[in-house]
A protein has these predicted regions:
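Short, conserved active-site loop motifs that form the nucleotide-linked donor/cofactor pocket
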Residues: 9, 67-70, 126, 175
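Active-site nucleotide-sugar/metal-binding loop of Leloir-type enzymes
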Residues: 84-97
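Short beta-strand-to-loop acidic/aromatic patch adjacent to the donor-nucleotide binding site
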Residues: 94-108
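Acidic donor-binding segment of Leloir-type glycosyltransferases
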Residues: 27-76
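N-proximal low-complexity "stem/linker" segments adjacent to membrane-targeting elements
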Residues: 1-30
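Alpha-helix termination/capping residues and helix-transition junctions
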Residues: 31-33, 63-66, 91-92, 100, ...
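Catalytic-site signature of metal-activated, phosphate-bearing donor transferases
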Residues: 79-87, 106-229
Length: 229
């Protein structure tokens, strides 16, 4: 925590060629003013051949406007390497908490409630917590999006061909991190999927929104994730 008794909260964004989605995150003043740093890990994945649909200088232009952006170029890297980069940076910068919010997602805070929630989490041993996320017109569910430091864990490559690699997150001693989210549900019962009464952390909500991506890009994304663990 800082000397002002506030938390150092960072945001980790896995990004490529999605400036409108990123702008949706950055232009929420409540979110931008509260967080300490926004780590944008830029780059097209290894093995993807689709071309960018927007001008690649957009990201540079945004970094000149939004000083909290910390941009790292990792073009040609695997998803797992890109996601591990923001954990590495959060560890170096000694963030207290991290929120994972990709560029096809956005979020909103009630800062007073969020700070109260983070104080509650300080006393808990788990490092992963659920956030209520909406996919408009499709589903509402609690997802692992809030993480507590120290950020000594990393994603490990899955041994199963049909498992997305960033779903595996482990400490060096083999402790699994994502599953720690379920400890929250023991005293905050999990709700039915699509129920608006999801038991996520109070003070933060997220939305999944692909409307800024073209139909071709959404299809290319789906094909890539289906074929690449």
């Amino acid at each position: 925590m800082t000397s002002e008794n506030t938390y150092r909260v960072g945001v980790g964004i896995n990004y490529w060629d999605d400036p409108k989605g990123l702008i949706k995150i950055l232009t929420n003043d409540t979110v931008y003013d509260y967080v300490e740093k926004i780590y944008v890990i830029d780059g097209r994945y290894e093995g993807r051949m689709d071309e960018a649909e927007s001008h690649m200088d957009y990201l540079t232009d945004l970094s000149e406007i939004y000083s909290k952006l910390h941009i790292v170029s990792m073009d040609g890297s695997k998803q797992i390497a890109k996601r591990n980069k923001y954990w590495e940076l959060a560890q170096v910068d000694e963030m207290d908490y991290m929120i994972v919010c990709d560029s096809d997602e956005y979020m909103d805070f009630d800062v007073t409630k969020l700070i109260g929630s983070l104080r509650t989490l300080d006393a808990r041993p788990e490092k992963c917590y659920p956030v209520k996320q909406h996919m408009e017109g499709i589903s509402v569910m609690s997802r692992p999006r809030l993480f507590k430091g120290p950020f000594t864990f990393r994603h490990l490559q899955s041994e199963k061909d049909n498992t997305i690699s960033h779903g595996s997150l482990y400490e060096k001693d083999g402790t699994e991190i994502i599953n720690q989210m379920y400890a929250w549900f023991k005293d905050h019962p999990k709700r039915q999927i699509n129920s608006d009464d999801q038991s996520g952390i109070d003070g933060i909500k997220m939305w999944h929104d692909k409307t800024f991506r073209s139909r071709d890009r959404v299809i290319a994304d789906r094909v890539y994730y289906d074929e690449t663990p």
